[in-house]
């Protein structure tokens, strides 16, 4: 396409507005009739803050084409409707479009959202794209269309937990051969000071992680690796994404080329320094080269994974040999989508084969939930699933205890409100050294994007305690404004995704999606502030269903009652799901917390 055609295409696209720069309001002045609707009003806008979203002028928040609203007219109408919404009404949003306001009651959700849901036979990208081109549909990803995205921080702790557990499983009894002689596994010579880039007690000191993808989700990888004590190399095909991660301090430095990257890896591994390195290039081209060099005696990674947007072969994965400009032009032309998808799929197969090659060298290799194994399998890589997904490999024991990506946002816009809530979490859980260390690392290393927010994995029995404590802080005036509490859809009981969160369930119920539907119904009945039900997040059309929940702590007694219900029920539904599948840890957790599970004694 020529420049004139590109400009005309953008001018005609109702989802693009070059003049828009959206930021959520701060402070205590209300634009809506209550803090409950004000919270949705601010969080929708926060999702499109240029410091938060990947491509805000296109309404894209993260994850390929994960949008906050269907088009700009819908965005404006949602805000207008929220400003007028009464406390006994609920707004219904269908794939990013406000379609109705109905009389409910004060404890009902103020917003109910359904995004990207298709009847199973039609749940594929071809049907989605046909509807999307007509302006009839929207891809909501997980937290994009449910208005609770907080930037890369939203996934950084989960990625950190994954990397740290991988270190414990694979390397707890053997320090890295790259560490200089005389250095301890903590990266310190006896009697010496410790570099600020060294992480004490890490099983990954002197080791490096190889991955790709620096988008909204993948962008958490370098910082997560650093917090876990590892060196990391993340390949990314777009310089703008590398620049974004450098600017927000998720990435430490960029290598000039593959040789420079390997030299930097060796330098920092030898010193036990946890440093993240970005490399501009195509993973389908660079991973095979790294395999070749490793086989020839070069550096071998200690862990291999990937977070490219392989779930969306049109908008998410650059085919090998293509320029970014060619890729963008093909995305804009529906006639090229079939060819683009085919080329991207072939490249994914090459990418996965390289990951399998690393696994054959004895290197732990794990899928991070972007469906790239499925794409490769469909392309003829019949052993694509030889390496596991990250949930069954490292995370499921946490899910069995109702632990997951609990998050909260300060509607005041004041970072001090977050720091005060950090302190409150430490006070509530004085003996949880893991949570204390996480909060200390987060404050030191994580830059806020948009409204100040915090991610902290908490479990059943902890989430509601935190929510009630925050509500009391608001009531007493210790915080400047109410707190929004939410989570990722990637959580203990809110998702069915056979190639990711529910892969390899003990009872074989990987694809049973009753559970996220029950989760959404339960949170609606409990009085959440807004509830969402999505399809296709993370792994693409046809491969997942998942639910989101958000609840506001506004300091009122009514909020306290809702928080006590919703934050117990939400985590409890995850424990229920895993107990039903036969996980003893979940059964024990259910009994400790007094859950009533009729079929489990």
Curated annotation (Swiss-Prot):
SUPFAM superfamilies noted in UniProt: Urocanase
The keyword Amino-acid biosynthesis is annotated on this UniProt entry: no
Note accompanying the cofactor annotation: Binds 1 NAD(+) per subunit.
Positions of the catalytic residues: 456
Protein name per Swiss-Prot or TrEMBL: Urocanate hydratase
Gene Ontology process terms (BP): L-histidine catabolic process to glutamate and formamide; L-histidine catabolic process to glutamate and formate
Catalytic activity: 4-imidazolone-5-propanoate = trans-urocanate + H2O
Stretch list, region Disordered: 179-200
Involved pathway(s): Amino-acid degradation; L-histidine degradation into L-glutamate; N-formimidoyl-L-glutamate from L-histidine: step 2/3
Entry EC number(s): 4.2.1.49
Compartment(s) of residence: Cytoplasm
EC top class, as a word: lyase
Binding site for NAD(+): 63-64, 141, 216-218, 236, 282-283, 307-311, 317-318, 368, 538
Required cofactor(s): NAD(+)
PANTHER family registered for this protein in UniProt: UROCANATE HYDRATASE
GO cellular component, one term: cytoplasm
Family label: Belongs to the urocanase family.
Main location class: cytoplasm
Keywords on record: Cytoplasm, Histidine metabolism, Lyase, NAD
GO terms of molecular function: urocanate hydratase activity
PROSITE patterns assigned to the protein according to its UniProt record, in alphabetical order: UROCANASE
InterPro entries, A to Z: Urocanase, Urocanase-like, Urocanase_C, Urocanase_central_sf, Urocanase_CS, Urocanase_N, Urocanase_Rossmann-like, Urocanase_sf
Function noted in UniProt: Catalyzes the conversion of urocanate to 4-imidazolone-5-propionate.
